[in-house]
UniProtKB/Swiss-Prot annotation:
Keywords: Ribonucleoprotein, Ribosomal protein
Sequence ranges of Basic and acidic residues compositional bias: 146-157
Gene Ontology biological process terms in this record: cytoplasmic translation; negative regulation of neuron apoptotic process; ribosomal large subunit biogenesis
InterPro entries xrefs: Rib_uL2_dom2 (IPR014722), Ribosomal_eL14 (IPR039660), Ribosomal_eL14_dom (IPR002784), Translation_prot_SH3-like_sf (IPR008991)
Region Disordered: start-end pairs: 135-166
Superkingdom of origin organism: Eukaryota
Pfam families: Ribosomal_L14e
PANTHER family according to UniProt: 60S RIBOSOMAL PROTEIN L14, LARGE RIBOSOMAL SUBUNIT PROTEIN EL14
Annotated Gene Ontology cellular component terms: cytosolic large ribosomal subunit; cytosolic ribosome
GO molecular function, one term: RNA binding
Family: Belongs to the eukaryotic ribosomal protein eL14 family.
Protein name: Large ribosomal subunit protein eL14
Keyword Ribonucleoprotein: yes
Gene name for this UniProt entry: RpL14
Organism taxonomic ancestry: Eukaryota, Metazoa, Ecdysozoa, Arthropoda, Hexapoda
Amino acid sequence: MPFERFVQTGRIAKASAGPLKGRLVAIVDVIDQNRVLVDGPLTGVPRQEYRLNNLHLTKYRIKFPYTAPTRIVRKAWTESDLKAQWKVSPWSVKAQNICKRSSLNDFDRFKLRYAKRQRNKLLTIAFNTLKKRTKADGTPRVLKKDRRERLRAEKAKGGKKAAAKK
C-alpha cells in the first residue's frame, strides 16, 4: 500500500507542539522542505508559518486553490463537513479518551477501578460456569492443535475438503 499522506495544499494536519497543540489546520502553501503556511479558520488558528516537525498529517484533504485566502479555506472547510468527520475518526476518539482519562481525580480513578473489578468478577463467574458445564458433559474443549489433527485425518481419508476440490 503506497504512502498517501502527502504535504500538499488542502491537506489537514493536527498540530502536535507549540501554542496550537491539538488543533486542526489546513496546509495552504509549502514554503520550503521544513515549513508550511497553515490556516485554521474554524479552529481558531490564524494564517501563519508552521514547522512540519510540529504537524501530524491526517488522511483528510479539502479542495481549494493554491494560496487561497482565508474566506475560501473557510468555505471549503464547511462544505467538506470536516468537523463531523474528525469527531468520529479513531484518532480523535483516542485523543478525547486520553484527555478524559488525564482529567480524572482520585475518586474517579477509584470508581473506575471498582467498576473494572466488578466487570472482571462477572466475566470470571461466567467463564467458570461454562468450564464446569463442559467438564460435567464430558465434552473436551476444542483446541487448535486437536482441530488441525482432525483436519489432517479427514484430508487423508478424502473427506470434505477433497470432495470440494473435485
